């Protein structure tokens, strides 16, 4: 089921995916459109299905304009430490690895800074093993 929300006009392109991080400024509390802007769940990954013609003013985004868009929750991929419970169809509690290996190419999918923890997910697919420079047995999963 799709939802209606707002995004900066320069980002409003059908097919684009983003992770909703919540309000970007305290000024958003004063805006009459805040309920439309923030009706998504923080930390969830969304795909833009359709960009509507409606354009509204916004003092946060560049160009000071936001477009009305239809979104659906997109498939998300995460890296998790392997255990017996990591199998397709199982429900797990997603937690950040809080890794400090800053040059690792997987740090963003291991350190889940945009995810409200803990979050339960269902593993749709195990995409494979991830090479971890710290030696952890990691798997890339799709939920």
UniProtKB/Swiss-Prot annotation:
This is UPF0179 protein PTO0851. InterPro entries: UPF0179. Transmembrane segments: none annotated. Belongs to the UPF0179 family.
